[in-house]
């Protein structure tokens, strides 16, 4: 039975919804009352000529091979902190803003069901190509309005409560132990450097960890079963989708008018991943039924089993979305953490000192209790997110008319909130070009934390629509970094002046043959 329409599915999350409803109504009234004729119109917002902008992405154009960071930075220099990105080929315009007051205004007026457009190719596939699978359940990535609210309410307790992660501490540690052995196998015995394609190994580690949560199984792609065809299909498609989304939904594309080769590849990719996911979850269901028939008491603690209790269709969709949203972004973040620590050996030594107090031996187990005492580890990861921002920011569609930077922006307008760019500006972060995990810790003399605008540090989004996988990513990152730095001293002896580029999300622009030297004690 599909319980999404049941009382249970809509009753979860009542508290936050009520409070956000009253807050959103108040914000809407304030925003509406503040709009006057003195404000400039939407048409007066600076913007490039649509056809010149389109030509800039064509062969020989200014932005032909540019990352999203490069061309938005160029636009910001020309037009200022707010401008319109022209829509074309069936895609509407969107506003880009780098003003913290604008960012706050949009979030304060997003309502109880925030709308995030921008993944049209995935939405089209789910609504028109495979409605037999998705139907009314589009997943958190693609759904909007009340449908999104019901789904989010139903699955929020599964992902957002810390107790839901307890069962994963030990298996995640085991996966990382396997990764450590893999590093020892592939590193050069003389230089101790890993191969140039080490980012593929990192992606396999992240895929293995997320696959454990999404599919209740280890795929074996790190060492044991590297050629598993089903696992490889999921692995490759999860990495391809973001790149294809960037080409279809961010760069100018005619896929809404004609079926382009890139869109056809996207359709094949989404179909392939869906077929494998359905096959794997059917195997899980069959195994679960056998256990029931054998009289075994089933304790549904895993995230997947709890999702299947809601609706098997929800389980399929969420399992895929975990991989699509998580593999590339988390793998790049892990590469960035290792790079930051290798280029700042004093910070690496300080982190290892903290880890030694929690993990006296290399094979010490990590658990819910001892991982509470790792403030410097969390500060390192948080500072890496600031130092190498993952993307430009968050997209929202205005739920009502708002004033942004003095301009009247009508309801229904999509706005790109460029908060991540602000994390590298001295206005908000002193010494922004320095890697300083200490900025996130309490001052040892005053006991106070750094004061920073909450609308400049939003790596996982904000409000009801913030990333539902945040706790999963936090656990994976903390476990992996702790295990690696406890076991190895990490170095990087190459140029790292421009190590990453931002397409849809941040991705490596260079190879990462890190040097891993064993820690003796």
From Swiss-Prot:
GO cellular component terms given for this protein: mitochondrial membrane
Needed co-factor(s): heme
InterPro entries: CYP11_CYP27_families, Cyt_P450, Cyt_P450_CS, Cyt_P450_E_grp-I, Cyt_P450_sf
Record-linked CDD domains: CYP24A1-like
Keyword field: Heme, Iron, Membrane, Metal-binding, Mitochondrion, Monooxygenase, Oxidoreductase, Transit peptide
Pfam families xref list: p450
Transit peptide: 1-19
Record's subcellular location: Mitochondrion membrane
GO BP terms: response to DDT; response to insecticide
GO molecular function, one term: heme binding
Gene3D superfamilies: Cytochrome P450
Family classification: Belongs to the cytochrome P450 family.
Protein name: Probable cytochrome P450 12d1 proximal, mitochondrial
């Amino acid at each position: 039975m599909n319980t999404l329409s049941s009382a249970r599915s809509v009753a979860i999350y009542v508290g936050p919804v009520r409070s956000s409803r009253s807050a959103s109504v108040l914000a809407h009234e304030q925003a509406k009352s503040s709009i006057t004729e003195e404000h400039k119109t939407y048409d007066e917002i600076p913007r490039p000529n649509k056809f010149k902008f389109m030509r800039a992405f064509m062969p020989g154009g200014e932005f032909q091979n540019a990352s999203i960071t490069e061309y938005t930075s160029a636009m910001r220099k020309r037009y200022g902190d707010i401008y319109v990105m022209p829509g074309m080929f069936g895609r509407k315009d969107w506003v880009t803003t780098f003003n913290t007051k604008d960012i706050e205004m949009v979030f304060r007026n997003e309502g109880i069901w925030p709308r995030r457009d921008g993944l049209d190719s995935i939405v089209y596939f789910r609504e028109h190509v495979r409605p037999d699978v998705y139907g009314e359940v589009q997943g958190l990535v693609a759904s909007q309005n009340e449908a999104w609210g019901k789904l989010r309410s139903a699955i929020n307790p599964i992902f957002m409560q810390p107790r839901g992660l307890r069962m994963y501490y030990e298996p995640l540690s085991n996966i990382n132990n396997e990764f450590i052995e893999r590093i020892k196998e592939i590193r050069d015995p003389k230089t101790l450097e890993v191969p140039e394609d080490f980012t593929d190994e990192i992606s396999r580690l992240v895929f293995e960890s997320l696959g454990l949560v999404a599919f209740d199984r280890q795929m074996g792609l790190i060492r044991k079963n590297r050629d598993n065809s089903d696992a490889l299909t999921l692995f490759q498609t999860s990495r391809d989708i973001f790149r294809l989304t960037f080409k279809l939904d961010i760069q100018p594309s005619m896929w809404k008018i004609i079926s382009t080769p890139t869109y056809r590849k996207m359709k094949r990719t989404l179909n392939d991943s869906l077929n494998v996911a359905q096959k794997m979850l059917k195997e899980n269901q069959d195994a679960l039924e056998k256990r029931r028939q054998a009289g075994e008491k089933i304790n549904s603690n895993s995230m997947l089993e709890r999702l299947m209790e809601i609706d098997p269709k929800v389980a399929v969709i969420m399992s895929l979305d975990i991989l699509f949203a998580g593999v590339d972004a988390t793998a790049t973040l892990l590469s960035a953490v290792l790079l930051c620590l290798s280029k700042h050996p004093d910070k690496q030594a300080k982190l290892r000192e903290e880890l030694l107090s929690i993990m006296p031996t290399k094979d010490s187990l990590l658990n819910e209790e001892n991982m509470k005492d790792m403030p410097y580890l969390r500060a390192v990861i948080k500072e890496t997110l600031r130092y190498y921002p993952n993307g430009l920011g968050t997209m929202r569609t205005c739920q009502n008319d708002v004033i942004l930077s003095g301009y009247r922006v009508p309801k229904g307008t999509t706005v790109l909130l460029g908060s991540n760019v602000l994390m590298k500006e001295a206005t908000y972060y002193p010494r922004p070009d320095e890697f300083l995990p200490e900025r996130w810790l309490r001052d040892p003399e005053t006991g106070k934390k750094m004061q920073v605008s909450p609308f400049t540090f939003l790596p996982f989004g904000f409000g009801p629509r913030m990333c539902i996988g945040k706790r999963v990513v936090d656990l994976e990152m903390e476990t992996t970094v702790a295990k690696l730095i406890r076991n190895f001293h990490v170095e990087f002896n190459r140029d790292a002046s421009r190590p990453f580029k931002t397409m849809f999300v941040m991705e490596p622009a260079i190879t990462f043959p890190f040097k891993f030297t064993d820690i003796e004690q």
